[in-house]
Amino acid sequence: MAMRQCAIYGKGGIGKSTTTQNLVAALAEAGKKVMIVGCDPKADSTRLILHAKAQNTIMEMAAEAGTVEDLELEDVLKVGYGDVKCVESGGPEPGVGCAGRGVITAINFLEEEGAYEDDLDFVFYDVLGDVVCGGFAMPIRENKAQEIYIVVSGEMMAMYAANNISKGIVKYANSGGVRLAGLICNSRNTDREDELIIALAERLGTQMIHFIPRDNVVQRAEIRRMTCIEYDPAAKQSDEYRELAQKIISNEKLVIPTPVTMDELEELLMDFGILEEEDESVIGKTAAELEA
């Protein structure tokens, strides 16, 4: 099987890193060789696989060593649960420089050091929030990641982010092989959430590849810096991640998405009762004025 490179995008705080690590643990359990490349200055993309607070990042270690050329692959690549390879790109101090540069530097370093040559089945890039700035778009722009999965929920801002990320994919799809592979709904228990995300997926020309229900076992596992798969293999939630893993293994629906306009997105939210019908007469009015 040829190595598949997948990037996970989505609104900040949606649960991308947790979803990615649980998915990767399920893939490893199924016998797949996987590497996670964390593309977020927070460096929290590998903690559940490594049982660590935060892995040392390529950018931190390069700063200590002098340059990235002074690093060895074994300095930055750690192996965790299920023999999953873990790397964190990291970024500059807050308020200084461009964190996206860290992603570019890290991926180039991994390529030069042969990290991708070890007959891997999957590489997952866990990418910061809904920022589609140049650096964070690197896995898409440089044709590193071929499959993009967007973690979403029934909340309005998560859906806005999914639509914006789809626009970013369209921008680079024509020049490279990058495609949208599906939406992963990480449930927030909002009304008619699964129906809403299926409808959004249809508008974007893709699929809701899996609906992950909300379950407190995820938090219990996280407190112990573990994935559900490792912490409680018999939990129903662990089976949800296994099901997602199997769907990704067999997924062949890779599309150039069809992003919608803001009006169309708001229309969809109104259809599902998430947004109220817009009433022009209340715009710009304070609570006191509306009561008057």
Swiss-Prot record:
Its cofactor is [4Fe-4S] cluster. SUPFAM superfamilies: P-loop containing nucleoside triphosphate hydrolases (SSF52540). Belongs to the NifH/BchL/ChlL family. ATP binds at G10, K11, G12, G13, I14, G15, K16, S17. The keyword Iron applies. Pfam families: Fer4_NifH. Homodimer. [4Fe-4S] cluster binds at C98, C133. It comes from the Bacteria. It catalyses: N2 + 8 reduced [2Fe-2S]-[ferredoxin] + 16 ATP + 16 H2O = H2 + 8 oxidized [2Fe-2S]-[ferredoxin] + 2 NH4(+) + 16 ADP + 16 phosphate + 6 H(+). CDD domains: NifH. Keywords: 4Fe-4S, ADP-ribosylation, ATP-binding, Iron, Iron-sulfur, Metal-binding, Nitrogen fixation, Nucleotide-binding, Oxidoreductase. InterPro entries: NifH/chlL_CS, NifH/frxC, Nitrogenase_Fe_NifH, P-loop_NTPase. The key enzymatic reactions in nitrogen fixation are catalyzed by the nitrogenase complex, which has 2 components: the iron protein and the molybdenum-iron protein. The reversible ADP-ribosylation of Arg-101 inactivates the nitrogenase reductase and regulates nitrogenase activity. This is Nitrogenase iron protein. It comes from Teredinibacter turnerae (strain ATCC 39867 / T7901). Binds 1 [4Fe-4S] cluster per dimer. Its EC number is 1.18.6.1. One of its GO terms (molecular function) is ATP binding. The keyword Oxidoreductase applies. Transmembrane segments: none annotated. HAMAP family: NifH.
